[in-house]
Amino acid sequence: LNQVSDAEKEFGGIRLWGTIGWIVAGQVVGFLALEKNPGDLVMTFKIAGAISLVFGIYSFFLPDTPPPKAGKDVSFREIVGLDALKVLKIKNYAVFFIASILICIPLAFYYGQANIFLNEIGMQGAAQKMSLGQMSEAVFLFLMPWFFRRLGVKYMLLVGMLAWVVRYLCFAYGDLDSGLWMLYLGIILHGICYDFFFVTGNIYTDQVAGPQVRSSAQGLITLATYGLGMYIGFWAAGAIAGANVILDAGGEVTNHHWDKVWLFPAMFAAGVTVLFLLFFKKSEKQDIA
């Protein structure tokens, strides 16, 4: 974000390339049929490791982004990023911050259980079909500036959270027969689920944080969401999925009561949405530094 002049207009186009990476990864897994044999899944880590090494080397050639206080004295508080905590003094941002942590709990259900769910119910090429979600994400990233001008931060975030509710209801009641459309809708909603909440959240954080703490503020929200929120979410997803297993006569897991598994994140996301609607009053665009 330090490299752009207008985050609302430019960030979506930059973030789009990350989405393209997700699409390519899903297509590669499907093309190589790595899901069919659990023993072949080790190849996914080898491919990911090789690509990560290439990008690690490439990162040395990225544009120089010296810290705002380069060459100046800095305090320990600034070094460890504690100065970013001042953004929480803004009431609306504090509400958004808490909602972000909470919404990552149901988010973890998708990341941790969706592929298992689709494979378990018999969907062929689940990883490839899940990349439809990233294709949807690419479309909405392109449309982000248009939605920003018409909806603003609050309603962008609300639409994103509501999409999580609808997605999990689709998974709870969808099947490979007459409910197949619900499964595809649940996958395709990823564009709204992710872009309208998390990408909007990154831009909102950029708006309320001053230039001196912008990077620290982004690090703080990332730690809170993908650290704390996702940790709780993956623990909850594993516990709830484990409590809803279907066993054969030999005690082996053959399936899950997926309707019960998906209803929990649907209800949780609905609760977070209601709380956000009540306590986030309006969009604030101001620097804190």
Language model features with spans:
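Intracellular juxtamembrane helix-capping segments at the cytosolic ends
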Residues: L1-S5, F196-G210
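Juxtamembrane intracellular "pre-TM" segments in multi-pass secondary transporters
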Residues: P63-I98
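Helix-loop boundary and gating motifs at the non-cytosolic
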Residues: N92-S131, F198
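Multi-pass alpha-helical transporter architecture, strongest
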Residues: I51-D64, W258-A289
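Helix-to-loop junctions at the C-terminal end of transmembrane segments
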Residues: A33-L34, F140-V153, A241
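A membrane-interface helix-boundary motif in multi-pass transporters
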Residues: F31-I51, A239-A269
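Loop-to-transmembrane helix entry
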Residues: K9-T19, V42-K46, N119-A138, W181-M182, ...
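C-terminal ends and interior cores of transmembrane alpha-helices
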Residues: L162-L176
